[in-house]
């Protein structure tokens, strides 16, 4: 028994069949290849009804869709249709040659058609069928966006590209990862600049124009005309990949296989951006593997280098890079297999999640050795002339493209941090509350745990040596305090001037108002010293960091400029002590005050509320932290400005990992447009919403409630 909907679905399909019989090529080009016994269309009505549902792509039909299609047919003039038909007919003879150019088997090409294979009958049948995307866009038909069935499901009918095609594509990447990463981040910076300037220009134009309301009315009246001429579907890429003359492609949408499949006419711009983000993750992994392979084959396995280095030195220098490369190879292979399933990539974050949870521990081992690796490399350059000469000779090889040996050694750490950002880029483009969003959030969480473990591994090695060195330099005038602890590390150290108070001699000459003291600030302890000869420090006071309070003095003139008050609520003698301290500059005073006692008023304020309306900057020059309270910046990092000094220093919080620290303002440029800042915050909140304690608390309550009901 058929319903009314099935009858409505059947009518336009029979019409398309009747029109397609006028052309010899129409049915064969529109539908996937069928077995020989099913190639002929049935003649009887019953057979047609039994076979029709199997040919329909599962997209719900709505009356709005039909009206939009009919309106589009009426708007198109006869001359335009003839012109398009004449443009399509000459291409039909080239279809075989185009396929052979891709090195694709003929037997696997029939399931999808290319735009060059359309004739008049096939075009009319495709437009009257229920398949979306054949010239009809969601803007023309709102029913498509409201339909529960997405366009991605319709793309399941598209046949995958053979494995050899993707492997050849990956092998033709001509960039080393260092070049790839630099080009990508620089293009990202330039894209943000253009977006900022474009939106800002539009906002200025809207303020100058006095007839904005009338223009909006004219736009509403012209919506029907826009249905007749569909807008451009191609999305502007955020990051231009592989801009290299030796590479035969730049973007996912520029691949010949993608352009010939007609899929760009089906996908919405946001879905194309998502495809570009996933494609970048795969191609960047291929570039990274290429650089790792060069590190191993060109440097590590060099016979002359093996003779120069002691086995222990080689082990420290290269660590477990073979394990890292093996994981990267398997990871890349699975990503390639995923791309071979369909020319439209379904998802990659599930693969990232599995590898981050089960295999990326090799990165923690490698990165944790970074401190000893850098030290060993410097010692070898200084002490072994043969090593220095050989490395310089190997770096001149054209394979290295002028890149130093040290840039290859830090590849794993750069890759694991960049991989997290690539997953964030995917997360910003997937549909909210979808399965792909959940997978991306899980992958991002696992990668963040790996990155944190890598950072902790590096810090643990360097902190232990630093604490031992500080302990040896200290002499206690008071009760000794144990400095070395596994849970203690240095936050800041430096010299300040303590105000001792005016003292007048018999000659009425004022003695020195300030005297130098030296502070060691740890994460849980403050030690106040005086520097003595022999590079030693005499400790005369200390206090837990949680019992410190700071207060900035108002402008009292040049003498008391950059002066602040430090209060120890309970010092080494169990008494309250007050110190009036003077810094060398305003930025130094602000940095000490921020480190000694962070703003307690915002300690328990939510992440969302404390960052609203914050100024933002993006990093345009990389910066390496020189002191523990500074923040290392990478190109294209976006940061919120929390504190700014007049002498050019900024205390900021990086959005993608919420790390805080000081950095020179000359390394960044401000994002002026409020819309861009709001968009950056929105994306940040979406990425970190799994870490929101309120959200996790509510989630735990829901779980507890469900258990109680059971």
UniProtKB/Swiss-Prot annotation:
Changing residue 177 to F: Loss of ephrin-mediated growth cone collapse. No effect on interaction with EPHA4. Residues 1-272 are annotated as: Regulatory region. PROSITE patterns: DH_2, PH_DOMAIN, SH3. GO terms for molecular function: ephrin receptor binding; guanyl-nucleotide exchange factor activity. Acts as a guanine nucleotide exchange factor (GEF) which differentially activates the GTPases RHOA, RAC1 and CDC42. Plays a role in axon guidance regulating ephrin-induced growth cone collapse and dendritic spine morphogenesis. Upon activation by ephrin through EPHA4, the GEF activity switches toward RHOA resulting in its activation. Activated RHOA promotes cone retraction at the expense of RAC1- and CDC42-stimulated growth cone extension. The modification Phosphotyrosine is found at residue 177. Residues 273-457 form the DH domain. InterPro entries: DBL_dom_sf, DH_dom, Ephexin-1_SH3, Ephexin-like, PH-like_dom_sf, PH_domain, PH_ephexin, SH3-like_dom_sf. This is Ephexin-1. Highly expressed in brain and to a lower extent in eye. Residues 1-146, 192-234, 688-710 are annotated as: Disordered. It comes from Mus musculus. Src-dependent phosphorylation at Tyr-177 upon EPHA4 activation increases the guanine exchange factor activity toward RHOA. Phosphorylation by CDK5 upon EPHA4 activation by EFNA1 may regulate dendritic spine morphogenesis. Residues 1-20, 688-699 have a biased composition (Basic and acidic residues). The keyword Cytoplasm applies. GO terms for biological process: cell differentiation; ephrin receptor signaling pathway; negative regulation of dendritic spine morphogenesis; nervous system development; regulation of GTPase activity; regulation of synapse pruning. Residues 211-227 have a biased composition (Acidic residues). GO terms for cellular component: cytosol; glutamatergic synapse; growth cone; membrane.
């Amino acid at each position: 028994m058929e319903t009314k909907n099935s009858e409505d679905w059947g009518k336009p399909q029979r019409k398309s069949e009747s029109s397609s019989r006028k052309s010899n090529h129409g049915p064969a080009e529109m539908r996937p290849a069928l077995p020989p016994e099913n190639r002929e269309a049935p003649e009887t009505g019953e057979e047609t009804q039994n076979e029709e549902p199997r040919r329909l792509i599962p997209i719900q039909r709505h009356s709005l869709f039909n009206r939009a299609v009919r309106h589009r047919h009426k708007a198109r003039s006869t001359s335009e249709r003839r012109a398009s038909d004449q443009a399509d007919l000459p291409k039909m003879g080239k279809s075989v040659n185009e396929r052979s150019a891709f090195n694709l088997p003929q037997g696997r090409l029939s399931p999808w058609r290319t735009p060059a294979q359309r004739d008049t009958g096939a075009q009319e049948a495709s437009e009257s069928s229920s398949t979306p995307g054949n010239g009809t866009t969601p803007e023309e038909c709102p029913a498509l966006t409201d339909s529960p069935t997405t366009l991605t499901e319709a793309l399941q009918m598209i046949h995958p590209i053979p494995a050899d095609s993707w492997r050849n594509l990956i092998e033709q990447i001509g960039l080393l990862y260092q070049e790839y990463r630099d080009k990508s981040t620089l293009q990202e910076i330039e894209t943000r600049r253009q977006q900022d300037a474009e939106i800002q220009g539009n906002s200025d134009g809207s303020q100058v124009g006095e007839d904005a309301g009338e223009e909006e009315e004219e736009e509403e009246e012209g919506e029907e005309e826009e249905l007749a001429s569909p807008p451009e579907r191609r999305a502007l890429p955020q990051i231009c990949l592989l801009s290299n003359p030796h590479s035969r492609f730049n973007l996912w949408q520029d691949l010949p296989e993608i352009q010939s499949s007609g899929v760009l006419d089906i996908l919405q711009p946001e879905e194309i951006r998502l495809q570009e983000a996933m494609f970048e993750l795969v191609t960047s992994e291929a570039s990274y593997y290429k650089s790792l392979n060069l590190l191993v084959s060109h440097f590590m396995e060099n016979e002359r280098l093996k003779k120069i280095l002691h086995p222990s030195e080689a082990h420290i220098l290269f660590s477990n890079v073979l394990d890292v490369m093996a994981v990267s190879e398997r990871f890349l292979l699975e990503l390639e297999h995923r791309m071979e399933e369909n020319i439209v990539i379904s998802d990659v974050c599930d693969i990232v999640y599995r590898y981050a949870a089960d295999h990326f521990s090799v990165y923690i081992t490698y990165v944790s050795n970074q401190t000893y690796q850098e030290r060993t490399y410097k010692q070898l350059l200084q002490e072994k002339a043969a090593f220095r000469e050989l490395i310089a000779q190997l770096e001149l090889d054209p394979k290295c493209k002028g890149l130093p040996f040290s840039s290859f050694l830090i590849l794993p750490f750069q890759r694991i941090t960049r991989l997290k950002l690539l997953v964030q880029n995917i997360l910003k483009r997937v549909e909210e509350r979808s399965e792909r969003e959940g997978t991306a959030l899980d992958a991002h969480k696992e990668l963040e745990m790996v990155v944190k473990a890598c950072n902790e591994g590096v810090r643990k090695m360097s902190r232990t040596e630093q604490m031992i060195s500080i302990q040896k330099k200290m002499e206690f005038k008071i009760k000794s305090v144990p400095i070395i602890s596994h849970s203690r590390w240095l936050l800041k150290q430096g010299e300040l001037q303590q105000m001792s108070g005016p003292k007048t001699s018999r000659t009425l000459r004022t003695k020195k108002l300030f005297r130098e003291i030296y502070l060691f600030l740890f994460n849980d302890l403050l030690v106040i010293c005086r520097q003595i000869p022999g590079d030693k420090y005499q400790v005369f006071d200390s206090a837990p960091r949680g019992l410190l309070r700071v207060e900035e003095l108002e402008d009292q003139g040049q003498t008391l400029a950059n002066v602040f008050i430090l209060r120890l609520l309970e010092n080494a003698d169990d008494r309250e002590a007050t110190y009036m301290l003077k810094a060398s500059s305003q930025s130094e005073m602000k940095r000490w005050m921020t480190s000694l006692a962070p703003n307690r008023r915002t300690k328990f304020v939510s992440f969302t509320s404390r960052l609203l309306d914050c100024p933002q900057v993006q990093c345009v020059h990389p910066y390496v932290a020189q002191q523990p309270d500074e923040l290392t910046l990478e190109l294209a990092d976006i940061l919120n400005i929390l504190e700014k000094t007049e002498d050019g220093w900024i205390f900021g919080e990086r959005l993608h990992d919420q790390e805080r620290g000081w950095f020179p303002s000359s390394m960044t440029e401000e994002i002026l447009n409020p819309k861009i800042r709001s968009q950056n915050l929105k994306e940040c909140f979406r990425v970190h919403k799994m870490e929101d304690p309120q959200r996790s608390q509510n989630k735990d309550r829901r779980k507890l409630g469900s258990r109680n009901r059971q």
